[in-house]
């Protein structure tokens, strides 16, 4: 069943009225960031012809988690601090007895039944929640997120990495590796270029870890009250928790990885054609959330 578009009439004026009242004391005018991010999203949707393009059905809302008590909706995006936000929601909803989100293991946070999904509600409940609750997502540079997924899922040595190697890696190597490459080493590690060739040829929707945010969260079809960014997540999380009257809850510190530092190293392995083709696959995420190539790779596409 289709879910009709819910209009919240968000505007910069509304932001100026709301955010000063809920911003943490040490935050520097977070509502100004929201004005910029909301305008970027609105213009991106309109300029790309994506406004209301997707007809939203119930099963498309699987990534939106629900906290009825705090009237909060969170669209989780893998590789964008979603483990910590899932932990926080488990504390907020009482699904966990923990008082500190970091006490909840990552495996527990990712259990399918750890938090209620919007798609599990009735259609009237979904419409009411979208109308009345605070809906937010966290964005990240598409290429940074993609590299994080590759390194975590294909270069690791744990149960989850082994699953990805078996589920995707063997197929990618079989189809995209040149016969002579690594013939003597017997390497079963997918190279970054092989992974990118797989995405270019077969699409980016085979797994949620590299599916674009545009497809996971439907930002041009649903009205988001708050757009967070991975780069500013400590301040953004504090603002959101203040908005839902949970200021004492501390968002776990985000682990400082080396993904951003490694971007140029990995992307230098790709041809210009491959980078352009990959950009097209994630173009909506780049334009909706205001990301570019220059700040990551040192150049932009002409």
Q: What positions do the PLM features span?
A:
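Membrane-interface amphipathic segments in extracytoplasmic regions
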Residues: 2-302
